[in-house]
Amino acid sequence: MSDIQIAQANEATEMKSITAIAEQIGLQATDIEQYGPYKAKLNFQAINRLKEKEDGKLVLVTSINPTPAGEGKSTVTVGLGDALRQLDQSAVIALREPSLGPVMGMKGGATGGGYAQVVPMADINLHFTGDMHALTATVNTLAALIDNHLQQGNVLNIDPRRIIWKRALDINDRALRQVVIGLGGPVQGMPRQDGFDITVASELMAILCLATDITDLKNRISKIVIGYNYDREPVTVGDLEVTGAIAMLLKDALKPNMVQTLEHTPALVHGGPFANIAHGCNSILATQTALKLGDIAITEAGFGADLGAEKFLDIKVPQLGKTPDTIVIVATIRALKYNGGVALADLTTENLDALKAGFSNLAKHIANMQRYGVPVVVSVNEFTSDTAAEVQLLQDLCQAMKVTAVPTSVWANGGQGGIELAKAVLAALQQPKAFKPLYDPQADIKSKLTTVVTEIYGGRDVVFEGKAINQLKQIEKNGWAHLPVCIAKTQYSLSDDPKALGAPSDFTIHVRELIPKLGAGFIVAMTGAVLTMPGLPKKPAALNMDVTADGQISGLF
Protein backbone atom coordinates (compact mmCIF):
# COMPACT_ATOMS: atom_id res chain seq x y z
CA MET A 1 0.00 0.00 0.00
CA SER A 2 1.05 3.61 -0.55
CA ASP A 3 1.63 6.00 2.34
CA ILE A 4 -1.76 7.64 1.93
CA GLN A 5 -3.54 4.27 1.70
CA ILE A 6 -1.88 3.15 4.94
CA ALA A 7 -2.80 6.45 6.59
CA GLN A 8 -6.42 6.32 5.39
CA ALA A 9 -6.88 2.70 6.47
CA ASN A 10 -5.69 3.53 9.98
CA GLU A 11 -7.34 6.94 10.22
CA ALA A 12 -10.73 5.37 9.57
CA THR A 13 -10.58 3.11 12.62
CA GLU A 14 -7.62 3.95 14.84
CA MET A 15 -7.30 7.72 15.32
CA LYS A 16 -8.02 9.06 18.78
CA SER A 17 -9.69 12.39 19.34
CA ILE A 18 -7.23 15.22 19.76
CA THR A 19 -8.59 15.82 23.26
CA ALA A 20 -7.59 12.25 24.18
CA ILE A 21 -4.09 12.83 22.79
CA ALA A 22 -3.86 16.05 24.81
CA GLU A 23 -4.89 14.21 27.97
CA GLN A 24 -2.04 11.71 27.44
CA ILE A 25 0.45 14.49 28.06
CA GLY A 26 -1.37 16.30 30.83
CA LEU A 27 -3.29 18.87 28.80
CA GLN A 28 -6.94 19.72 29.32
CA ALA A 29 -9.59 20.50 26.73
CA THR A 30 -9.33 24.19 27.70
CA ASP A 31 -5.62 24.18 26.74
CA ILE A 32 -6.29 23.55 23.07
CA GLU A 33 -8.26 25.12 20.23
CA GLN A 34 -9.70 22.36 18.05
CA TYR A 35 -9.72 22.34 14.26
CA GLY A 36 -12.10 19.43 13.92
CA PRO A 37 -11.77 16.18 15.91
CA TYR A 38 -8.11 15.39 15.12
CA LYS A 39 -6.22 18.70 14.92
CA ALA A 40 -5.69 21.46 17.45
CA LYS A 41 -3.58 24.42 18.40
CA LEU A 42 -2.18 24.96 21.88
CA ASN A 43 -3.28 28.27 23.33
CA PHE A 44 -0.91 30.76 24.91
CA GLN A 45 -2.30 30.21 28.40
CA ALA A 46 -1.22 26.57 28.26
CA ILE A 47 2.17 27.44 26.78
CA ASN A 48 2.83 30.01 29.51
CA ARG A 49 1.78 27.58 32.24
CA LEU A 50 4.13 24.91 30.89
CA LYS A 51 7.13 27.24 31.18
CA GLU A 52 7.32 26.35 34.86
CA LYS A 53 8.05 22.69 34.09
CA GLU A 54 11.54 21.26 33.67
CA ASP A 55 12.80 20.47 30.19
CA GLY A 56 13.03 16.90 29.00
CA LYS A 57 15.85 15.51 26.88
CA LEU A 58 16.22 16.74 23.30
CA VAL A 59 16.96 14.42 20.37
CA LEU A 60 17.78 15.98 16.99
CA VAL A 61 17.25 13.85 13.88
CA THR A 62 19.21 14.76 10.75
CA SER A 63 20.59 12.87 7.76
CA ILE A 64 23.21 12.52 5.08
CA ASN A 65 22.85 14.69 1.97
CA PRO A 66 19.55 13.76 0.30
CA THR A 67 19.62 11.67 -2.85
CA PRO A 68 17.00 10.49 -5.36
CA ALA A 69 17.15 7.16 -3.52
CA GLY A 70 15.50 8.73 -0.46
CA GLU A 71 16.56 8.74 3.18
CA GLY A 72 13.35 8.81 5.25
CA LYS A 73 14.33 11.31 7.94
CA SER A 74 10.77 12.28 8.90
CA THR A 75 9.75 8.62 8.85
CA VAL A 76 12.54 7.72 11.27
CA THR A 77 11.69 10.71 13.48
CA VAL A 78 8.09 9.53 13.79
CA GLY A 79 9.06 5.88 14.21
CA LEU A 80 11.59 6.74 16.91
CA GLY A 81 8.93 8.59 18.87
CA ASP A 82 6.58 5.62 18.59
CA ALA A 83 9.35 3.20 19.60
CA LEU A 84 10.28 5.22 22.66
CA ARG A 85 6.67 5.17 23.81
CA GLN A 86 6.58 1.40 23.32
CA LEU A 87 9.51 1.34 25.76
CA ASP A 88 7.34 3.31 28.22
CA GLN A 89 9.16 6.57 27.62
CA SER A 90 7.17 9.80 27.57
CA ALA A 91 8.09 11.01 24.07
CA VAL A 92 6.70 13.94 22.09
CA ILE A 93 7.58 14.67 18.46
CA ALA A 94 8.15 18.17 17.06
CA LEU A 95 8.13 18.40 13.25
CA ARG A 96 7.94 21.04 10.54
CA GLU A 97 4.67 21.37 8.64
CA PRO A 98 4.71 20.64 4.92
CA SER A 99 4.81 23.28 2.21
CA LEU A 100 2.28 22.84 -0.57
CA GLY A 101 4.92 23.58 -3.22
CA PRO A 102 7.02 20.44 -2.69
CA VAL A 103 3.89 18.37 -1.98
CA MET A 104 2.56 19.18 -5.45
CA GLY A 105 6.03 19.20 -7.01
CA MET A 106 8.79 16.68 -6.56
CA LYS A 107 8.44 15.42 -3.02
CA GLY A 108 4.84 14.41 -2.52
CA GLY A 109 3.67 14.14 1.11
CA ALA A 110 5.85 15.20 4.04
CA THR A 111 4.39 13.52 7.11
CA GLY A 112 6.60 10.44 7.38
CA GLY A 113 5.79 7.25 5.56
CA GLY A 114 4.47 3.71 5.80
CA TYR A 115 3.49 2.85 9.36
CA ALA A 116 5.46 5.78 10.80
CA GLN A 117 3.29 8.77 9.90
CA VAL A 118 1.61 11.72 11.52
CA VAL A 119 -2.11 11.95 10.82
CA PRO A 120 -4.54 13.10 9.48
CA MET A 121 -2.03 12.80 6.65
CA ALA A 122 -3.93 14.51 3.82
CA ASP A 123 -5.06 17.40 6.00
CA ILE A 124 -1.53 18.10 7.24
CA ASN A 125 -0.05 17.96 3.74
CA LEU A 126 -2.66 20.24 2.21
CA HIS A 127 -4.17 23.14 4.17
CA PHE A 128 -3.77 21.88 7.78
CA THR A 129 -4.75 24.68 10.19
CA GLY A 130 -4.13 27.45 7.68
CA ASP A 131 -0.72 28.59 8.94
CA MET A 132 0.85 28.67 5.48
CA HIS A 133 -2.06 30.65 4.07
CA ALA A 134 -1.88 33.12 6.96
CA LEU A 135 1.83 33.58 6.32
CA THR A 136 1.31 34.04 2.60
CA ALA A 137 -1.38 36.65 3.19
CA THR A 138 0.82 38.45 5.72
CA VAL A 139 3.85 38.55 3.43
CA ASN A 140 1.73 39.99 0.64
CA THR A 141 -0.03 42.45 2.93
CA LEU A 142 3.35 43.89 3.86
CA ALA A 143 4.28 44.08 0.16
CA ALA A 144 1.03 45.91 -0.58
CA LEU A 145 1.67 48.35 2.27
CA ILE A 146 5.14 49.08 0.90
CA ASP A 147 3.80 49.80 -2.57
CA ASN A 148 1.00 51.90 -1.12
CA HIS A 149 3.60 53.96 0.74
CA LEU A 150 5.35 54.65 -2.56
CA GLN A 151 2.04 55.64 -4.16
CA GLN A 152 0.88 57.90 -1.33
CA GLY A 153 3.83 60.28 -1.24
CA ASN A 154 6.77 58.10 -0.11
CA VAL A 155 7.45 60.02 3.11
CA LEU A 156 10.27 57.59 3.97
CA ASN A 157 12.00 58.35 0.66
CA ILE A 158 12.18 54.62 -0.19
CA ASP A 159 14.15 53.86 -3.34
CA PRO A 160 11.91 51.55 -5.43
CA ARG A 161 15.04 50.04 -6.98
CA ARG A 162 16.29 48.93 -3.57
CA ILE A 163 13.21 47.28 -2.08
CA ILE A 164 14.26 43.79 -0.98
CA TRP A 165 10.91 42.58 0.42
CA LYS A 166 9.31 40.12 -1.99
CA ARG A 167 5.81 38.78 -2.34
CA ALA A 168 5.18 35.08 -1.69
CA LEU A 169 3.12 32.05 -2.64
CA ASP A 170 3.23 28.57 -1.11
CA ILE A 171 3.65 26.94 -4.51
CA ASN A 172 6.54 26.23 -6.86
CA ASP A 173 6.15 28.79 -9.66
CA ARG A 174 9.29 29.71 -11.57
CA ALA A 175 7.37 32.23 -13.73
CA LEU A 176 7.03 34.51 -10.69
CA ARG A 177 10.70 34.73 -9.74
CA GLN A 178 11.06 38.05 -11.55
CA VAL A 179 8.03 40.27 -12.25
CA VAL A 180 7.28 43.91 -13.04
CA ILE A 181 4.43 45.52 -11.11
CA GLY A 182 2.61 48.85 -11.16
CA LEU A 183 2.07 49.04 -14.91
CA GLY A 184 -0.92 50.83 -16.42
CA GLY A 185 -0.48 54.47 -15.50
CA PRO A 186 -0.23 56.71 -12.40
CA VAL A 187 -3.27 55.31 -10.58
CA GLN A 188 -1.97 51.73 -10.81
CA GLY A 189 1.03 52.31 -8.56
CA MET A 190 4.76 52.85 -8.95
CA PRO A 191 6.24 50.61 -11.68
CA ARG A 192 9.13 48.58 -10.34
CA GLN A 193 10.78 45.21 -10.56
CA ASP A 194 9.63 42.70 -7.95
CA GLY A 195 9.59 38.96 -7.43
CA PHE A 196 8.04 36.11 -5.47
CA ASP A 197 9.61 33.75 -2.95
CA ILE A 198 8.01 30.52 -1.88
CA THR A 199 6.29 31.31 1.44
CA VAL A 200 8.59 29.08 3.48
CA ALA A 201 11.62 31.10 2.28
CA SER A 202 10.18 34.38 3.54
CA GLU A 203 11.69 36.05 6.58
CA LEU A 204 8.26 35.99 8.21
CA MET A 205 8.38 32.18 8.24
CA ALA A 206 11.75 32.30 9.99
CA ILE A 207 10.41 34.85 12.45
CA LEU A 208 7.33 32.72 13.17
CA CYS A 209 9.66 29.82 13.97
CA LEU A 210 12.01 31.83 16.19
CA ALA A 211 9.54 34.03 18.11
CA THR A 212 8.81 33.02 21.69
CA ASP A 213 5.57 34.98 22.17
CA ILE A 214 3.55 37.78 20.58
CA THR A 215 5.75 40.48 22.13
CA ASP A 216 8.85 38.87 20.65
CA LEU A 217 7.00 38.40 17.35
CA LYS A 218 6.23 42.13 17.18
CA ASN A 219 9.78 43.07 18.10
CA ARG A 220 11.18 40.86 15.35
CA ILE A 221 8.68 42.07 12.75
CA SER A 222 9.56 45.69 13.49
CA LYS A 223 13.22 44.97 12.64
CA ILE A 224 12.57 43.53 9.17
CA VAL A 225 14.51 45.51 6.57
CA ILE A 226 12.18 45.99 3.60
CA GLY A 227 14.61 48.04 1.53
CA TYR A 228 16.69 51.20 1.49
CA ASN A 229 16.03 54.89 0.95
CA TYR A 230 17.74 57.13 -1.58
CA ASP A 231 20.54 57.72 0.94
CA ARG A 232 21.02 53.93 1.07
CA GLU A 233 19.89 53.78 4.68
CA PRO A 234 17.80 50.76 5.76
CA VAL A 235 14.02 51.09 6.02
CA THR A 236 12.22 48.73 8.40
CA VAL A 237 8.67 47.59 9.07
CA GLY A 238 8.85 49.70 12.21
CA ASP A 239 9.56 52.74 10.07
CA LEU A 240 6.41 51.95 8.05
CA GLU A 241 4.44 51.84 11.33
CA VAL A 242 2.65 48.61 10.41
CA THR A 243 4.23 46.24 12.95
CA GLY A 244 0.97 45.76 14.83
CA ALA A 245 -1.04 44.95 11.72
CA ILE A 246 1.48 42.40 10.48
CA ALA A 247 1.71 40.72 13.91
CA MET A 248 -2.07 40.66 14.20
CA LEU A 249 -2.33 38.56 11.04
CA LEU A 250 0.02 35.97 12.55
CA LYS A 251 -1.35 35.75 16.09
CA ASP A 252 -3.04 32.39 15.53
CA ALA A 253 -0.35 30.99 13.23
CA LEU A 254 2.12 31.50 16.10
CA LYS A 255 0.33 28.84 18.17
CA PRO A 256 1.81 25.31 17.77
CA ASN A 257 -0.33 22.66 16.06
CA MET A 258 -0.91 19.29 17.71
CA VAL A 259 -1.76 16.02 15.94
CA GLN A 260 -0.83 12.35 16.48
CA THR A 261 1.08 9.52 14.88
CA LEU A 262 -0.56 6.31 13.68
CA GLU A 263 0.41 4.88 17.09
CA HIS A 264 -1.01 7.89 18.99
CA THR A 265 2.27 9.55 19.91
CA PRO A 266 1.61 13.29 20.36
CA ALA A 267 3.17 15.38 17.61
CA LEU A 268 3.60 19.15 17.43
CA VAL A 269 3.77 20.08 13.74
CA HIS A 270 4.52 23.76 13.35
CA GLY A 271 6.47 26.01 11.00
CA GLY A 272 8.33 24.90 7.93
CA PRO A 273 11.29 26.96 6.69
CA PHE A 274 13.36 25.16 4.05
CA ALA A 275 16.87 24.23 5.17
CA ASN A 276 18.51 24.98 1.84
CA ILE A 277 17.20 28.56 1.60
CA ALA A 278 16.27 29.28 5.24
CA HIS A 279 17.14 27.84 8.67
CA GLY A 280 15.19 24.61 8.26
CA CYS A 281 13.82 24.03 11.76
CA ASN A 282 10.34 23.85 13.23
CA SER A 283 9.21 26.56 15.63
CA ILE A 284 10.92 27.31 18.90
CA LEU A 285 7.49 27.35 20.57
CA ALA A 286 6.76 23.81 19.36
CA THR A 287 10.18 22.52 20.43
CA GLN A 288 9.98 24.24 23.82
CA THR A 289 6.48 22.88 24.38
CA ALA A 290 7.53 19.34 23.40
CA LEU A 291 10.37 19.59 25.93
CA LYS A 292 7.84 20.48 28.64
CA LEU A 293 5.21 17.89 27.68
CA GLY A 294 7.50 14.85 27.39
CA ASP A 295 10.57 13.42 29.04
CA ILE A 296 12.08 13.15 25.55
CA ALA A 297 11.40 15.56 22.67
CA ILE A 298 12.36 14.36 19.18
CA THR A 299 12.73 16.98 16.49
CA GLU A 300 14.25 17.11 13.02
CA ALA A 301 16.13 19.60 10.90
CA GLY A 302 15.74 19.82 7.14
CA PHE A 303 17.88 18.13 4.49
CA GLY A 304 21.38 16.95 5.44
CA ALA A 305 23.35 17.71 8.58
CA ASP A 306 25.40 20.29 6.65
CA LEU A 307 22.27 22.43 6.28
CA GLY A 308 19.45 21.81 8.76
CA ALA A 309 21.52 20.48 11.65
CA GLU A 310 24.22 23.15 11.33
CA LYS A 311 21.55 25.84 11.38
CA PHE A 312 19.72 24.16 14.26
CA LEU A 313 22.94 24.13 16.27
CA ASP A 314 24.25 27.57 15.32
CA ILE A 315 21.03 29.58 14.86
CA LYS A 316 18.20 27.88 16.75
CA VAL A 317 20.03 26.51 19.79
CA PRO A 318 21.23 29.92 21.08
CA GLN A 319 17.65 31.20 20.94
CA LEU A 320 16.08 27.97 22.19
CA GLY A 321 18.37 27.93 25.22
CA LYS A 322 18.68 24.15 25.03
CA THR A 323 21.26 21.99 23.28
CA PRO A 324 20.53 18.51 21.87
CA ASP A 325 21.35 15.61 24.15
CA THR A 326 21.73 13.18 21.23
CA ILE A 327 21.87 13.52 17.46
CA VAL A 328 20.52 10.78 15.17
CA ILE A 329 21.84 10.73 11.59
CA VAL A 330 19.62 8.87 9.12
CA ALA A 331 21.30 7.06 6.23
CA THR A 332 20.39 4.32 3.79
CA ILE A 333 22.65 1.80 2.13
CA ARG A 334 21.13 2.72 -1.22
CA ALA A 335 21.92 6.41 -0.77
CA LEU A 336 25.48 5.69 0.33
CA LYS A 337 26.03 3.52 -2.75
CA TYR A 338 24.67 6.38 -4.84
CA ASN A 339 27.26 8.64 -3.20
CA GLY A 340 29.80 5.98 -4.12
CA GLY A 341 29.04 6.33 -7.81
CA VAL A 342 26.34 3.70 -8.42
CA ALA A 343 23.55 4.62 -10.86
CA LEU A 344 19.98 4.75 -9.56
CA ALA A 345 19.00 1.69 -11.60
CA ASP A 346 21.73 -0.41 -9.96
CA LEU A 347 21.25 0.51 -6.30
CA THR A 348 19.48 -2.75 -5.44
CA THR A 349 22.57 -4.79 -6.38
CA GLU A 350 25.08 -5.55 -3.63
CA ASN A 351 28.18 -3.38 -4.02
CA LEU A 352 30.48 -3.26 -1.01
CA ASP A 353 33.13 -1.16 -2.74
CA ALA A 354 30.63 1.55 -3.65
CA LEU A 355 29.17 1.46 -0.14
CA LYS A 356 32.63 1.96 1.33
CA ALA A 357 33.32 4.83 -1.06
CA GLY A 358 29.96 6.48 -0.41
CA PHE A 359 30.43 6.13 3.34
CA SER A 360 32.65 9.22 3.06
CA ASN A 361 29.48 11.33 3.03
CA LEU A 362 28.11 9.79 6.22
CA ALA A 363 31.56 9.89 7.83
CA LYS A 364 31.79 13.63 7.24
CA HIS A 365 28.37 14.23 8.80
CA ILE A 366 29.26 12.06 11.80
CA ALA A 367 32.50 13.97 12.34
CA ASN A 368 30.67 17.28 11.97
CA MET A 369 28.09 16.42 14.61
CA GLN A 370 30.76 15.05 16.95
CA ARG A 371 32.52 18.40 16.50
CA TYR A 372 29.66 19.98 18.48
CA GLY A 373 30.29 17.67 21.43
CA VAL A 374 26.97 15.77 21.23
CA PRO A 375 26.64 11.93 21.21
CA VAL A 376 25.74 10.55 17.77
CA VAL A 377 23.69 7.50 16.72
CA VAL A 378 23.22 6.38 13.09
CA SER A 379 19.85 5.03 11.94
CA VAL A 380 20.22 2.74 8.92
CA ASN A 381 16.81 3.05 7.31
CA GLU A 382 16.28 -0.42 5.86
CA PHE A 383 15.25 -1.43 2.36
CA THR A 384 14.52 -4.98 1.20
CA SER A 385 17.47 -4.81 -1.20
CA ASP A 386 19.98 -4.33 1.64
CA THR A 387 22.20 -7.39 2.10
CA ALA A 388 23.57 -8.72 5.37
CA ALA A 389 27.10 -8.05 4.15
CA GLU A 390 26.27 -4.42 3.36
CA VAL A 391 24.62 -3.86 6.73
CA GLN A 392 27.57 -5.41 8.55
CA LEU A 393 30.08 -3.32 6.59
CA LEU A 394 28.21 -0.12 7.38
CA GLN A 395 28.01 -0.99 11.06
CA ASP A 396 31.73 -1.75 11.12
CA LEU A 397 32.59 1.54 9.42
CA CYS A 398 30.48 3.45 11.93
CA GLN A 399 31.92 1.51 14.85
CA ALA A 400 35.39 2.58 13.74
CA MET A 401 34.19 6.15 14.37
CA LYS A 402 32.86 5.07 17.80
CA VAL A 403 29.26 5.41 16.64
CA THR A 404 26.50 2.79 16.84
CA ALA A 405 24.65 2.15 13.56
CA VAL A 406 21.21 0.59 14.05
CA PRO A 407 19.10 -0.98 11.26
CA THR A 408 15.64 0.59 11.43
CA SER A 409 12.43 -0.65 9.77
CA VAL A 410 9.80 1.81 10.95
CA TRP A 411 8.29 2.31 7.48
CA ALA A 412 7.25 -1.35 7.40
CA ASN A 413 6.81 -2.05 11.10
CA GLY A 414 6.02 1.24 12.82
CA GLY A 415 7.41 1.77 16.29
CA GLN A 416 8.31 -1.91 16.64
CA GLY A 417 10.80 -1.45 13.81
CA GLY A 418 12.56 1.28 15.77
CA ILE A 419 12.96 -0.46 19.12
CA GLU A 420 16.70 -1.08 18.74
CA LEU A 421 17.21 2.51 17.58
CA ALA A 422 15.25 3.74 20.60
CA LYS A 423 17.44 1.64 22.90
CA ALA A 424 20.57 3.08 21.29
CA VAL A 425 19.20 6.60 21.70
CA LEU A 426 18.37 5.96 25.37
CA ALA A 427 21.93 4.74 25.89
CA ALA A 428 23.32 7.81 24.12
CA LEU A 429 21.19 10.07 26.32
CA GLN A 430 23.14 8.75 29.30
CA GLN A 431 26.47 9.76 27.79
CA PRO A 432 28.10 13.03 28.80
CA LYS A 433 27.94 15.93 26.37
CA ALA A 434 29.98 19.11 26.16
CA PHE A 435 28.31 21.29 23.56
CA LYS A 436 30.72 23.51 21.65
CA PRO A 437 29.39 26.20 19.30
CA LEU A 438 30.96 26.26 15.86
CA TYR A 439 31.83 29.94 15.82
CA ASP A 440 31.68 33.16 17.82
CA PRO A 441 28.74 35.23 16.51
CA GLN A 442 30.80 38.36 17.15
CA ALA A 443 33.32 37.31 14.50
CA ASP A 444 33.12 39.05 11.14
CA ILE A 445 30.88 37.69 8.37
CA LYS A 446 33.65 36.25 6.23
CA SER A 447 35.23 34.48 9.22
CA LYS A 448 31.92 32.86 10.16
CA LEU A 449 31.22 31.78 6.60
CA THR A 450 34.74 30.43 6.23
CA THR A 451 34.38 28.44 9.45
CA VAL A 452 31.19 26.77 8.23
CA VAL A 453 32.72 26.06 4.81
CA THR A 454 35.99 24.62 6.12
CA GLU A 455 34.73 22.86 9.26
CA ILE A 456 31.32 21.57 8.11
CA TYR A 457 31.43 21.42 4.32
CA GLY A 458 35.08 20.42 3.99
CA GLY A 459 35.88 23.23 1.56
CA ARG A 460 38.88 25.50 1.26
CA ASP A 461 37.52 29.05 1.31
CA VAL A 462 34.75 31.53 0.49
CA VAL A 463 34.68 34.15 -2.25
CA PHE A 464 32.21 37.00 -2.62
CA GLU A 465 30.93 37.74 -6.10
CA GLY A 466 28.62 40.25 -7.78
CA LYS A 467 26.23 42.01 -5.43
CA ALA A 468 27.69 40.30 -2.36
CA ILE A 469 30.84 42.43 -2.44
CA ASN A 470 29.04 45.72 -1.82
CA GLN A 471 26.42 44.07 0.38
CA LEU A 472 29.15 42.89 2.74
CA LYS A 473 30.39 46.47 3.09
CA GLN A 474 26.84 47.65 3.72
CA ILE A 475 26.26 44.99 6.40
CA GLU A 476 29.46 46.00 8.17
CA LYS A 477 28.62 49.71 7.88
CA ASN A 478 25.17 49.15 9.41
CA GLY A 479 26.55 47.17 12.35
CA TRP A 480 24.95 43.84 11.44
CA ALA A 481 28.11 41.75 11.15
CA HIS A 482 27.61 40.25 14.62
CA LEU A 483 24.63 38.18 13.45
CA PRO A 484 24.96 34.44 12.74
CA VAL A 485 25.12 33.32 9.12
CA CYS A 486 22.51 31.21 7.33
CA ILE A 487 23.97 29.73 4.16
CA ALA A 488 21.56 29.07 1.29
CA LYS A 489 23.13 26.16 -0.58
CA THR A 490 22.23 23.10 -2.60
CA GLN A 491 21.07 20.23 -0.40
CA TYR A 492 22.53 17.55 -2.66
CA SER A 493 26.21 18.12 -1.92
CA LEU A 494 28.49 19.33 0.84
CA SER A 495 29.72 21.88 -1.72
CA ASP A 496 27.70 24.38 -3.76
CA ASP A 497 27.86 22.03 -6.76
CA PRO A 498 24.90 19.59 -6.60
CA LYS A 499 26.82 17.03 -8.67
CA ALA A 500 29.77 16.78 -6.25
CA LEU A 501 28.74 13.72 -4.23
CA GLY A 502 30.47 11.91 -1.38
CA ALA A 503 32.81 14.15 0.60
CA PRO A 504 34.38 16.65 -1.80
CA SER A 505 37.29 18.75 -0.55
CA ASP A 506 39.46 21.70 -1.53
CA PHE A 507 36.52 23.54 -3.12
CA THR A 508 35.46 27.18 -2.94
CA ILE A 509 31.98 28.34 -1.95
CA HIS A 510 30.78 31.24 -4.08
CA VAL A 511 28.59 33.79 -2.28
CA ARG A 512 26.61 35.82 -4.81
CA GLU A 513 24.32 37.73 -2.45
CA LEU A 514 24.08 38.64 1.25
CA ILE A 515 20.59 39.37 2.58
CA PRO A 516 20.11 40.84 6.08
CA LYS A 517 17.24 39.19 7.95
CA LEU A 518 17.27 41.35 11.08
CA GLY A 519 13.89 40.14 12.31
CA ALA A 520 14.99 36.52 12.12
CA GLY A 521 18.39 37.53 13.48
CA PHE A 522 20.75 36.22 10.81
CA ILE A 523 22.43 37.07 7.51
CA VAL A 524 21.52 34.84 4.56
CA ALA A 525 24.40 34.04 2.20
CA MET A 526 23.11 32.96 -1.21
CA THR A 527 25.52 30.52 -2.87
CA GLY A 528 25.72 28.63 -6.14
CA ALA A 529 22.49 28.50 -8.12
CA VAL A 530 20.07 27.97 -5.21
CA LEU A 531 16.71 29.74 -5.68
CA THR A 532 14.16 31.13 -3.22
CA MET A 533 11.27 30.25 -5.55
CA PRO A 534 11.52 26.65 -6.78
CA GLY A 535 10.07 25.39 -10.05
CA LEU A 536 8.03 22.29 -10.76
CA PRO A 537 9.72 19.20 -12.26
CA LYS A 538 8.82 17.80 -15.68
CA LYS A 539 6.43 15.33 -14.05
CA PRO A 540 5.17 16.94 -10.83
CA ALA A 541 3.68 14.78 -8.10
CA ALA A 542 0.38 16.56 -8.80
CA LEU A 543 -0.05 14.38 -11.91
CA ASN A 544 -0.70 11.37 -9.66
CA MET A 545 -3.21 13.04 -7.35
CA ASP A 546 -7.00 12.87 -7.44
CA VAL A 547 -10.10 13.11 -5.28
CA THR A 548 -13.19 10.90 -5.57
CA ALA A 549 -16.82 12.01 -5.56
CA ASP A 550 -17.02 11.26 -1.83
CA GLY A 551 -13.89 13.30 -1.04
CA GLN A 552 -11.34 10.47 -0.77
CA ILE A 553 -7.86 11.66 -1.79
CA SER A 554 -5.44 9.45 -3.70
CA GLY A 555 -1.88 9.75 -4.97
CA LEU A 556 -0.67 12.19 -2.32
CA PHE A 557 2.34 9.92 -1.84
Curated annotation (Swiss-Prot):
Write the record's keywords in alphabetical order, separated by commas: ATP-binding, Ligase, Nucleotide-binding, One-carbon metabolism
Give the E.C. number(s): 6.3.4.3
Answer yes or no on keyword rRNA processing.
Answer: no
User: Could you tell me which Gene3D superfamilies the record lists for this protein?
Assistant: Domain 2, N(10)-formyltetrahydrofolate synthetase, Formyltetrahydrofolate synthetase, domain 3, P-loop containing nucleotide triphosphate hydrolases
Q: Where does ATP bind?
A: T67, P68, A69, G70, E71, G72, K73, S74
Alphabetically, which GO biological process terms does the record hold? tetrahydrofolate interconversion
Which pathway? One-carbon metabolism; tetrahydrofolate interconversion
Pfam families assigned to the protein according to its UniProt record, in alphabetical order: FTHFS
| Catalyzed reaction equations | (6S)-5,6,7,8-tetrahydrofolate + formate + ATP = (6R)-10-formyltetrahydrofolate + ADP + phosphate
Database matches in InterPro entries:
Formate_THF_ligase, Formate_THF_ligase_CS, P-loop_NTPase
Question: GO molecular function of the protein, one example?
Answer: formate-tetrahydrofolate ligase activity
Family membership noted in the UniProt record: Belongs to the formate--tetrahydrofolate ligase family.
Q: What is this protein called?
A: Formate--tetrahydrofolate ligase
